[in-house]
Curated annotation (Swiss-Prot):
UniProt cross-references to NCBIfam families, sorted A to Z: PRK10614.1, RND_permease_2
Cellular component, GO annotation: plasma membrane
Domain of life: Bacteria
Family: Belongs to the resistance-nodulation-cell division (RND) (TC 2.A.6) family. MdtC subfamily.
Protein name, UniProt field: Multidrug resistance protein MdtC
GO molecular function: xenobiotic transmembrane transporter activity
Predominant location category: membrane
UniProt KW keywords: Cell inner membrane, Cell membrane, Membrane, Transmembrane, Transmembrane helix, Transport
The organism of origin for this protein: Salmonella typhimurium (strain LT2 / SGSC1412 / ATCC 700720)
Length: 1026
């Protein structure tokens, strides 16, 4: 009593405290960063190594395996995967959430150093690492085009100057430059000319390497001067290499230009990049795992004027893709939804209280509670994101509930003629415990979320804390500011209302009278209500089992990502044509704004595409509908497939798969994996629950298998090393020398001129110089025949792995897909030597599925404990919790009605309903207990009176929560995929709960009261001594 009086009788102090909370909140709001979702990125580091010309199997055994053994000893590694292709290996290390990325990077470098001695010689550079996840979609893509500059020159400028500058911006983790490669001097050998001159390929390589050296020459000095010695020991251009003497034939000099074409070109000619049908260099920018995407993009945009100033006029720099506009639009939509929710909630209060002054009180209390929450969010290191703003939107209904309960009870005393200050004190004292019970039990719902681990726990923690803080501030405001404003602003009123207010008043009275009549009937038919209650419990169980489930709602971010997978024997020239064909099909779609893509490198039969869609307001279809439409057109392209998926704000794992979800096969036997993977992939492709099924196991690439006759080689004076060196020199794009320039280092690349290696007959022109200096054709000691070989070799941990990726057809949930996969694996009878498990997002979904029920039960148990402590009773918390089954039925039926799967967002809605619907029971039980204690009423009379007295605040609080959540259901635009499941769950649960709990709660209250009396009578019987 004294606590409440302290604030009621000191209005200036109370107002200043509220103002201080508001000012701190405004300051926190201005300082909060902006993000699509809470920070949930796993720390990921990518290790890269190259050995030009090495086969995928060689890369896997000689490069990947030593590195994996060393990297696997690092503490905190959650998952390690690797992919080895022609000449390159990439190892992805995913660390635990609590691992610092910089500390992990130091451990990775130490592991690379430890494995260095085990790696093969001939690697052009040491393995390197990057602190970025290659499977993440770029946060921004910049393109460089030019009418006069070559692709190699553009690439050099982009990688040497632009990429270096962008990489220094805070938050940037990796700048991947694609579309070409660095400039190089390319030496295209003529095998016949070499044979005629008696010059071996090794001799050419050694001559070039010896002619281009960079060594210190020292200095000469006398007593006065000092001269630095400088020589022309370096060759920098193709024109300087052409006259190089590489051999003497009968005293005549054989120059490099006599036996080869020497051109200024690029290191790897098998690279291509395009933007909207124009050749382009792509700068794909990815953020650090812990970086804020909006702040990083803003930093890049702020740097763009400086970048454009340093670019020559012949180069055009454009932003091809930017993730930030859709994120900002989504957050703006949430903020508008929040404002609408506040307005609707205040409208509900006005309709019930029919007083402008009374409505002004919650109109002040709600903003103070919500704005004050921003200060706590800033101190906790949170961000303004979809989930935290959704928490505040839902909190609108909660925070007004506390104010409504206090305000309505004070208003009731005022209507009875009590003086304002006395009514404020008396009304607050009567409901103070009720408000505390409602708030503490609501916060208790979120305690299990705070203890939840993994990605779901990290994702929901910010939501739970934000909502809990808002409820806590609301509790303080409702017991201090609200009664103070009631005591000083409201006046005692007469029983009659003004004529213009009679309509709403009569409706409320009529509803209350109708409720009283129906409640009497219900209390006389308790068994029927009991059957209905048990039916809702059973229906909950059935609906939860039957409803489709998924991890996170599929978002429409306005960006699509596509992976091209062509025939494994396709050439680079044909692959570049496929890229152009796919880009044309996509560019012609009316919903597409921009298309960029690239192909080449170590994976000749693959490519990547990034598609920016028009803003939501300029297109009618969702991203998934556009994908469905394009899938039909793209399927008509022969010899290649393009797999499209919508870019999501959450992507788990480091696998760069061609679909959203992955199922990984592991085996210690590569042969067993290669035998069973095609069978499993074929079976999964036939499932209607899956779409775009594809695999990263590609073991049907065309290979020419050379078989050496070692006896003949020994007799001819040729060793295996010389033969392998011949093949590497001829067909491996071998980097044989380095050209040093002020801004970068470039390579001299040697291979047989493509004009002489168009088919297998090129092998017949190859020869080796034996120990006697004679030219021995390759065909003398080797036979060759075509065979199949893998284009890539993949590992997970130290086991051979193959990942089958898939998307979901429209109308199919992730739970239906995973169940179908598990059922298929059982039906196929896959041996124990091949193990299957879900990866990435599908794996997290499986883990979340296992913990969902535990989480709901833990929340209910926590609420029960809190209520039991507050009421000092084992029974009354059960009465209050009896409201939950009806809310669960309503929520699940609403999700089914809207064809929305049960996702992590819907789980949040269920958790919120646990807190919301019990408020009705708390208000009933509190007044019934008080009536029994102080009024001497029977349980039947007490609960009946409590239901009637609390009918108006129950209707007000429920409608406030309902109208607070309704804008989430009706919202459209960017980000609505996240908001709608939450709104649907809450609105459905509230409607069903309001219809049932007004009747089931009093029945359950009486049931437990009779049960209590029965047990108390048994315990009170005298003990009979025998």
């Amino acid at each position: 009593m004294r606590f409440f009086a302290l604030f009621i009788y000191r209005p200036v102090a109370t107002i200043l405290i509220a103002a201080a909370i508001t000012l701190c909140g405004i300051l926190g709001f201005r300082l909060l960063p902006v993000a699509p979702l809470p920070q949930v990125d796993f720390p990921v580091i990518m290790v890269s190594a190259s050995l030009p010309g090495a086969s995928p199997e060689t890369m896997a055994s000689s490069v990947a395996t030593p590195l994996e053994r060393s990297l696997g000893r690092i503490a905190g590694v959650n998952e390690m995967t690797s992919s080895s292709s022609l000449g390159s290996t990439r190892i992805i290390l995913e660390f635990n959430f609590d691992r610092d990325i910089n500390g992990a990077a130091r451990d990775v470098q130490a592991a690379i150093n430890a494995a260095q001695s085990l790696l093969p010689g001939g690697m052009p550079s040491r393995p390197t690492y990057r602190k970025a996840n290659p499977s993440d979609a770029p946060i921004m893509i910049l393109t460089l085009t030019s009418e006069s500059w070559s692709q190699g020159k553009l690439y050099d400028f982009a990688s040497t100057q632009l990429a270096q500058t962008i990489a220094q911006i805070d938050g940037v983790g990796d700048v991947d430059v694609g579309g070409s490669s660095l400039p190089a001097v390319r030496v295209g050998l003529n095998p016949q000319a070499l044979f005629n001159q008696g010059v071996s390929l090794d001799e050419v390589r050694e001559a070039i390497d010896s002619a281009n050296v960079r060594r210190p020459q020292g200095a000469i000095e006398d007593s006065v001067h000092r001269w630095q010695i400088q020589t022309n020991d370096e060759l920098k251009t193709a024109a300087e290499y052409q006259p190089l003497i590489i051999h003497y034939n009968n005293g005549a000099a054989v120059r490099l230009g006599d036996v080869a074409s020497v051109t200024d070109s690029v290191q790897d000619v098998r690279n291509a990049g395009m933007t909207n049908a124009k050749p382009a260099i792509l700068l794909m920018i990815r953020k650090l795992p812990e970086a804020n995407i909006i702040q990083t993009v803003d930093g890049i945009r702020a740097k763009l004027p400086e970048l454009r100033a340093m670019i020559p006029a012949a180069i055009d720099l454009q932003i091809a893709q930017d993730r930030s506009p859709t994120i900002r639009a989504s957050l703006q939509e949430v903020e508008e939804t929040l404002a609408i929710s506040v307005a609707l909630v205040i409208l509900v209060v006005f309709l019930f209280l029919r007083s402008g002054r009374a409505t002004l009180i919650p109109a002040v209390a709600v903003p103070v509670s919500l704005i004050g929450t921003f200060a706590a969010m800033y101190l906790c290191g949170f961000s303004l994101n979809n989930l935290s703003l959704m928490a505040l939107t839902i909190a609108t209904g909660f925070v007004v509930d506390d104010a409504i309960v206090v305000l309505e009870n004070i208003a009731r005393h005022l209507e009875a003629g009590m003086k304002p200050l006395q009514a404020a004190l008396q009304g607050t004292r009567e409901v103070g415990f009720t408000v505390i019970s409602m708030s503490l039990s609501l916060v208790a719902v979120f305690l299990p979320l705070l203890l939840m681990g993994g990605l779901p726990g990290r994702l929901l923690r910010e939501f739970a804390v934000t909502l809990s803080v808002a409820i806590g501030i609301s509790l303080v405001v409702s017991l201090t500011l609200t009664p103070m404003m009631c005591g000083w602003m409201l006046k005692s009123s007469k029983p009659r209302t003004q004529p213009r207010k009679r309509g709403v008043g009569r409706l409320l009275v009529a509803l209350q009278q109708g409720y009283g009549t129906s409640l009497k009937w219900v209390l006389n038919h308790t068994r029927l209500v009991g059957v209905v209650f048990l039916g809702t419990v059973a229906l909950n169980i059935w609906l939860y089992i039957a409803i489709p489930k998924t991890f996170f709602p599929e978002q429409d971010t306005g960006v699509l990502m596509g992976g091209i997978q062509a025939d494994q024997s396709i050439s680079f020239q044909a692959m570049r044509g496929k890229l152009q064909d796919f880009m044309k099909i996509i560019r012609d779609d009316p919903a597409v704004n921009n298309v960029t893509g690239f192909t080449g490198g170590s994976r000749v039969n693959s490519g990547m595409m990034f598609i920016t869609l028009k803003p939501r307001g300029e297109r009618k279809e969702t991203a998934q509908q556009i994908i469905d439409r394009l899938r039909v057109k793209l399927a008509k392209e022969p010899g290649a497939r393009l797999f499209l998926m919508a870019v999501q704000d959450i992507r788990v794992g480091g696998r760069q798969a061609n679909a959203s979800y992955q199922y990984t096969l592991l085996s210690d036997s590569l042969a067993a994996l290669r035998e069973w993977e095609p069978k499993i992939r074929k079976a999964l492709s036939a499932l209607p629950q899956l779409a775009d099924v594809n695999s990263d196991q590609q073991d049907n690439g065309a290979e020419m298998n050379l078989i050496y006759d070692r006896d003949t080689m020994s007799r001819l004076g040729i060793d295996v090393q010389a033969a392998n060196s011949l093949l590497n020199n001829a067909f491996g794009q071998r980097q044989i020398s380095t050209i040093y320039q002020p801004m970068n280092q470039y390579k001299v690349v040697m291979e047989v001129d493509p004009r002489y290696s168009q088919d297998i007959s090129a092998l017949e022109k190859m020869f080796v110089i034996n120990r006697d200096g004679k030219a021995i054709p390759l065909s003398y000691f080797a036979q060759w025949r075509p065979a199949n070989a893998p284009l890539s070799v993949n590992h997970q941990g130290l086991s051979a792995a193959s990942t089958i990726a898939f998307n979901l057809p429209t109308g199919t949930s992730l739970s239906q897909a995973t169940e179908a996969i598990n059922r298929t694996m059982t039906q196929l009878g896959v041996p124990s030597t091949v193990r299957g498990s879900f990866s990435g997002t599908a794996q997290v979904f499986q883990q979340t599925m296992n913990s969902q029920l535990i989480l709901i039960v833990a929340a209910i148990a926590t609420v029960y404990i809190v209520l039991g402590i507050l009421y000092e009773s084992y029974v009354h918390p059960l009465t209050i919790l009896s409201t939950l089954p009806s809310a669960g039925v309503g929520a699940l039926l609403a999700l089914e009605l809207f064809n929305a799967p049960f996702s992590l967002i819907a789980l949040i809605g269920i958790m919120l309903l646990i807190g919301i619907v019990k408020k009705n029971a708390i208000m009933m039980v509190d007044f019934a207990l008080e009536a029994q204690r102080s009024g001497g009423l029977t349980p039947e009379q007490a609960i009946f009176q409590a239901c009637l007295l609390r009918f108006r605040p129950i209707m007000m609080t429920t409608l406030a929560a309902l109208f607070g959540a309704l804008p989430l259901v009706l919202s459209g635009g960017d980000g609505s995929e996240l908001r709608q499941p939450l709104g649907i769950t809450i609105v459905g649960g509230l409607v069903m709960s309001q219809l049932l709990t007004l009747y089931t709660t009093p029945v359950v209250y009486l049931f437990f009261d009779r049960l209590r009396l029965r047990f108390s009578r048994k315990n009170s019987k005298p003990v009979v001594e025998i």
